[in-house]
Amino acid sequence: MTDKPNNDQRSDLTLASRRSFLKHSIIAASGVALFGGMSLGMRSAAWAAGGDVETSKAKLGFIALTDAAPLFVAAEKGFFAKYGMTEVEVLKQSSWGTTRDNLVLGSAKNGIDGAHILTPMPYLISAGIVTPNNQPVPMSILARLNLAGQCISVGEEYRDLKIGLDSTPFKAALEAKKAGGKKVSAAVTFPGGTHDLWMRYWLAAGGIDPNADINTIVVPPAQMVANMKVGSMDTFCVCEPWNAQLINQKIGYTANTTGELWHNHPEKAFALRSDYVATNPNAARALTMAIMEAQQFCEKAENKEEVAKICSQRKWIGAPYKDIVDRMKGNFAYGTGKVIENHP
């Protein structure tokens, strides 16, 4: 199934039945009910010994991004095993399209049970909007992995414009480039995903029609920098460490963080197939508790450097430590002289 955001896909995303979408949104949000009114301490005590998990197995997907760190840390620090999930596989996916395809398959068909995922995707998958033959695959969101933390970056050729939150100066530059017979492109990671939404909003706010004035292309996160380097795009929206790497390689700079567009917006989620949750509710709780404990570890300032080192490992993100650590600590150098420290 192609992930190119063609006109038909845009129409599907816009015109999908509101009733159907709301119905499946309720399904996707159903994971909240797993914990009821239990306090975090009560949950931890209940599952510290593994409880009575129905299975110790789960296959979880992730994309090479720093907001997947809770899954890496849960695996590295033994948090999955602590809660009885001793056979968890955390598996790198090549793209969000691959994540979608493997969730549709499920682990019984050599796919995955759950994933670190763009927040809109469980809803879109549950509603059958982005699945083969529009077949709904019910999903459950178990946890919010992070808020904000993404960036929109632009290529080095636009350095003199110092493009920021206001994309208006970008419009004239793109028009001039097109007048010279060259293509202009904006890269996102998945049609209808958060990066797609932030990019479209930012462009449109500056008078750039994302459907008519610029080509919108889908590029996997880990391939953004390489594609910018060879001139395949003019701007992209993605999570770290790829924006920082772009700057470190002197290929471009950060125009804005997505938190500047919407403060503390929901970003990635931890989601499972709803049939896994229904069959293994205790295991689903255990997985969520492990990830929540990993999140608490990641949030502590004294652990940031260790988490960055974990993320840099080849089996996880596989990017240099220097491309990860500063922004993980909340220190954002935009590559234009603008610096924000202690960014949440």
Language-model segment annotations:
Residues 25-33:
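Sec-dependent signal peptide hydrophobic core
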Residues 152-153, 269-272, 276-277:
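Short glycine- and hydrophobic/aromatic-rich loop-to-beta-strand nucleating segment
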Residues 48-211, 215-218, 233-244, 251-264:
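Short, glycine-/small- and polar/acidic-enriched structural segments
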Residues 112-114, 218-254, 273, 309-327:
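Ligand-binding pocket segment of bilobal, Venus flytrap-like solute-binding proteins
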Residues 279-344:
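Secondary-structure end/capping motifs
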Residues 39-49:
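Signal peptide processing junction and immediate N-terminal pro/mature segment
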Residues 1-20, 34-35, 43-44:
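N-terminal secretory signal peptides
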Residues 75, 98, 102, 194-201, ...:
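Extracytoplasmic/secreted proteins, especially bacterial periplasmic and envelope-associated proteins
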